[in-house]
């Protein structure tokens, strides 16, 4: 359970970071 929770949290953090980077580099609207 704890491992799954950590994995999901990691995925969410990674997705958010990618979105922020994309916004900074003008790759996203």
From Swiss-Prot:
Q: What is the protein's membrane topology class?
A: Multi-pass membrane protein
Q: GO CC: one term?
A: chloroplast thylakoid membrane
**Where does it live in the cell?**
Plastid, Chloroplast thylakoid membrane
What keywords would UniProt list here? Answer: Chloroplast, Membrane, Photosynthesis, Photosystem I, Plastid, Thylakoid, Transmembrane, Transmembrane helix
Q: Which InterPro entries match?
A: PSI_PsaG/PsaK_dom
Q: Name one GO biological process term.
A: photosynthesis
TM ranges are 3-23
Could you say which protein family the record assigns here? Belongs to the PsaG/PsaK family.
Q: Indicate what this protein is called per its UniProt record.
A: Photosystem I reaction center subunit psaK, chloroplastic
Q: Which organism is it from?
A: Spinacia oleracea
